Amino acid sequence: AIGSFYLIVFAVIAAAVYSSTSIRYVRILSLGSSWLFLGLITLMWAGAFLSEGSSVGEFFTTFALLGDYFVNLHNFILPINDYHEFYLYWWFAWSIMIGQFTARFVSGIKTYQVLAAMMIFPSIPIGIWFTVLYYYSANAIPVTGISNLAMVFVGTTFVINSLDSLVRLYTDNLNLTVKRFGKTKYFIGNVALLSGLTLLFKLDFLQIQWVGALAIGLILGCFGYILLAHYRKVVEIKNSPKENKIDFNKIELVN
């Protein structure tokens, strides 16, 4: 069982590294994973609310229960416990990558539009997804066969998509690119690096709390440096330079 687990992890890492060799692959996987998720929601929704003994009306009744989350939000926030700690440190650990990666694709978009695109609009399908999952759990509906396989496949695709974006980002930042080393050396080097880091997380000294704390320190350090050294330059920024706009048609032609 342990051997199979590491084999799956290695396959996911290898797929993510290969996808990161081209921004075209990253884009295809990103769009593909989103459509697969919507397809999974549709499949699970139909299995729950179009089956015998159920109705579409029960979906709306269950969906309305999401309002209780906001009414009782204070109970989920305080007191802070180990769950909050783990989630927050995980969020901070990913925030640097997510922020920098997103910044490359939001040229010309206002801050409120970025907020809507990344937090508000995605919350709608996620809300529907958790409504469906809750209905399955509350009514003891078994998840078997194609539904179970679809959940595993979509979940794995999302992991690959997240990881290939991370690989693409740090290789560009450190100039460890395919253009510099070639696809074979790039692939082998990054697979070895990520596999090694994955194994290190089995050790007690490397935990998400430490990684998250390091990320918080980096964020605060960079923010302080910008305020002290580049404040005037930053406040003069009105919008993203035109040269930062990405033309995906040109990317597809190059690839």
What are these regions (language model features)?
Residues 20-46, 116-119, 208-223:
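Membrane-interface loop-to-helix entry segments
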